[in-house]
C-alpha cells in the first residue's frame, strides 16, 4: 500500500504496543506492562489524531512535534477529538518513558509503539532504516479524513498540530 488518503477506511486489525499511564507507575523509572492496543477496535467510534515520528527522544520530535501537540491539546479537544496518539517504532517501554518525560499523564496523549514499524511499513510510510516516517492521520469513526506524510525526516509542517487543527 502506498499511504492512506482521505476517504480510505482505517485498516482493520491494527494493533500497537502500549503501556497505559498509571499514577503508581508515574515516575519515569517505573516500568509498566505493555498491552496490545487494538487501534482498529478502540477507534472505530471515535475521532482520532494519530501522528507518527521517526523516534522518541530525537531532536525535532522532542523539541517541536510532541510539545506542540501538548500545547494545542485544549484546542484539539474543543474540535471534538477523542483520542490523540503519537506513534514511533521504539518499544513500549521507551514510548512510556517519553510520555513521562513530557509530563503527559492519564490518556491525554497515548504514546504508542509500532513494533518493527509494522503498521507504518504496511501503509508504505516507514523509512529504509525501518523507522516510522513523520506523518499524521485524522480518523473519524473509522474513516480517514486527513492524511499527510512529511517529505523529509526533519521536516515538520503537514503533520504539525497547527496544520492538523486546520483539517478538523
UniProtKB/Swiss-Prot annotation:
Q: Which PANTHER family match?
A: PEROXIREDOXIN (PTHR10430), PEROXIREDOXIN PRXA-RELATED (PTHR10430:SF30)
> What family is it from?
Belongs to the peroxiredoxin family. Prx5 subfamily.
InterPro entries per the UniProt record, alphabetical? PRX5-like, Redoxin, Thioredoxin-like_sf, Thioredoxin_domain
Q: What else is known?
A: The active site is a conserved redox-active cysteine residue, the peroxidatic cysteine (C(P)), which makes the nucleophilic attack on the peroxide substrate. The peroxide oxidizes the C(P)-SH to cysteine sulfenic acid (C(P)-SOH), which then reacts with another cysteine residue, the resolving cysteine (C(R)), to form a disulfide bridge. The disulfide is subsequently reduced by an appropriate electron donor to complete the catalytic cycle. In this typical 2-Cys Prx, C(R) is provided by the other dimeric subunit to form an intersubunit disulfide.
**Null phenotype?**
Renders cells sensitive to reactive oxygen species. Renders A.fumigatus avirulent in a mouse model of pulmonary aspergillosis.
UniProt KW Mitochondrion keyword = no
Name the residues annotated as catalytic in the UniProt entry. 61 (cysteine sulfenic acid (-soh) intermediate)
What EC number(s) does the entry state?
Answer: 1.11.1.24
Q: What residues does the Thioredoxin domain cover?
A: 4-158
Task: Tell me the GO molecular function terms.
Answer: IgE binding; protein homodimerization activity; thioredoxin peroxidase activity
Complex and partners: Homodimer; disulfide-linked, upon oxidation.
Record function comment: Thiol-specific peroxidase that catalyzes the reduction of hydrogen peroxide and organic hydroperoxides to water and alcohols, respectively. Plays a role in cell protection against oxidative stress by detoxifying peroxides and as sensor of hydrogen peroxide-mediated signaling events. Required for virulence.
Report if keyword Disulfide bond is assigned.
yes
The record's gene field reads aspf3
GO cellular component, alphabetical, reads: cytoplasm; mitochondrion; peroxisome
* Name of the protein: Peroxiredoxin Asp f3
One Pfam match: Redoxin
Q: Which reaction does it catalyse?
A: a hydroperoxide + [thioredoxin]-dithiol = an alcohol + [thioredoxin]-disulfide + H2O
Q: Where are the transmembrane segments?
A: none
Q: What GO biological process terms does the UniProt entry carry, in alphabetical order?
A: cell redox homeostasis; cellular response to oxidative stress; hydrogen peroxide catabolic process
Q: Which UniProt keywords apply?
A: Allergen, Antioxidant, Disulfide bond, Oxidoreductase, Peroxidase, Redox-active center
Amino acid at each position: 500500500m502506498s499511504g492512506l488518503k482521505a476517504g480510505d477506511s482505517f485498516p482493520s486489525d491494527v494493533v500497537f504496543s502500549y503501556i497505559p499511564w498509571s499514577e503508581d507507575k508515574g515516575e519515569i523509572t517505573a516500568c509498566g506492562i505493555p498491552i496490545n492496543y487494538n487501534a482498529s477496535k478502540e477507534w472505530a467510534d471515535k475521532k482520532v489524531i494519530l501522528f507518527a515520528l521517526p523516534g522518541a527522544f530525537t531532536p525535532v520530535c522532542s523539541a517541536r512535534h510532541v510539545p506542540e501537540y501538548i500545547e494545542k491539546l485544549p484546542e484539539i479537544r474543543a474540535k471534538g477529538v477523542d483520542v490523540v496518539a503519537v506513534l514511533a517504532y521504539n518499544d513500549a517501554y521507551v514510548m512510556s518513558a517519553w510520555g513521562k518525560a513530557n509530563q503527559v499523564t492519564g490518556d491525554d496523549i497515548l504514546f504508542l509503539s509500532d513494533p518493527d514499524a509494522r503498521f507504518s511499513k504496511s501503509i508504505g510510510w516507514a523509512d529504509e532504516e525501518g523507522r516510522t516516517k513523520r506523518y499524521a492521520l485524522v480518523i473519524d469513526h473509522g474513516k480517514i479524513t486527513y492524511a499527510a506524510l512529511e517529505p523529509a525526516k526533519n521536516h515538520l509542517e503537514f503533520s504539525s498540530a497547527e496544520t492538523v487543527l486546520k483539517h478538523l
